[in-house]
């Protein structure tokens, strides 16, 4: 039987390649006569490293180039960290599969020269590195005595900057650290009570052409239903708020006894305004749960906070 050829578009960063190679391996293990190849490339977000992510804009920073390859027929699927994939996709493309989630929490990584191992024990004036406005807003709200500094680059580059003495600690996604073998550098898994994680964090999203039934059937073997239900609720929450990857919006989701528990928050950039709420809903209608939570936060003033943030973004670009 002739092998079916499948080409994956991927970012070329170390973490992206680890994730894409995992997808390749799992597909070839589960689908007989499948020949998978990888096309690795740099995205806009990979190339612009001297500007804070929020100042660049967030519409497909890490995905556009991969999507272009699919739309012109040069790739069949694209593997993304789901947190980087916008909730509104280009015409002709869809989120075809969500894989089993790694730990979605944020993690604290401390400089080797320090012996402070938790956020709450960091002394006043400690320099904390993060490129995420979501983390920044929540941590400013909880720890106003700390100093926050932007940090760019891939996971390995950020750890090198930390060890070179530029920061006392940095905040990264626990999932990325674990996938790259840096679990021993995690000093604290940050509780959701302190920092809600990004929408989709810890899961991989596989994007493909909407009408490619053969490819959709192939990638379905990697679908993890509980992860998918949680992430679809999170993405619906973000979409309803009309937020993006670089806006201070955080979530936490769990499934218990057939019920979906979704917590969400919206914060101002300085962390002084923070609105948080939870919705419990039907696990079989995850998007409705996300939409309901977004509506609740809007009623509490989330719209006003987000409008102020977008206005500030526009002023900074001019």
Curated annotation (Swiss-Prot):
<comment type="subunit">
    <text>Monomer.</text>
</comment>
<comment type="pathway">
    <text>Porphyrin-containing compound metabolism; protoporphyrin-IX biosynthesis; coproporphyrinogen-III from 5-aminolevulinate: step 2/4.</text>
</comment>
<dbReference type="InterPro" id="IPR022418">
    <property type="entry name" value="Porphobilinogen_deaminase_C"/>
</dbReference>
<dbReference type="GO" id="GO:0005737">
    <property type="term" value="C:cytoplasm"/>
</dbReference>
<keyword id="KW-0627">Porphyrin biosynthesis</keyword>
<dbReference type="InterPro" id="IPR022417">
    <property type="entry name" value="Porphobilin_deaminase_N"/>
</dbReference>
<dbReference type="InterPro" id="IPR022419">
    <property type="entry name" value="Porphobilin_deaminase_cofac_BS"/>
</dbReference>
<dbReference type="GO" id="GO:0004418">
    <property type="term" value="F:hydroxymethylbilane synthase activity"/>
</dbReference>
<dbReference type="GO" id="GO:0015995">
    <property type="term" value="P:chlorophyll biosynthetic process"/>
</dbReference>
<dbReference type="Pfam" id="PF03900">
    <property type="entry name" value="Porphobil_deamC"/>
</dbReference>
<feature type="modified residue" description="S-(dipyrrolylmethanemethyl)cysteine">
    <location>
        <position position="245"/>
    </location>
</feature>
<dbReference type="Pfam" id="PF01379">
    <property type="entry name" value="Porphobil_deam"/>
</dbReference>
<protein>
    <recommendedName>
        <fullName>Porphobilinogen deaminase</fullName>
        <ecNumber>2.5.1.61</ecNumber>
    </recommendedName>
</protein>
<keyword id="KW-0808">Transferase</keyword>
<keyword id="KW-0149">Chlorophyll biosynthesis</keyword>
<dbReference type="InterPro" id="IPR036803">
    <property type="entry name" value="Porphobilinogen_deaminase_C_sf"/>
</dbReference>
<comment type="pathway">
    <text>Porphyrin-containing compound metabolism; chlorophyll biosynthesis.</text>
</comment>
<dbReference type="InterPro" id="IPR000860">
    <property type="entry name" value="HemC"/>
</dbReference>
<dbReference type="GO" id="GO:0006782">
    <property type="term" value="P:protoporphyrinogen IX biosynthetic process"/>
</dbReference>
<comment type="function">
    <text>Tetrapolymerization of the monopyrrole PBG into the hydroxymethylbilane pre-uroporphyrinogen in several discrete steps.</text>
</comment>
<comment type="similarity">
    <text>Belongs to the HMBS family.</text>
</comment>
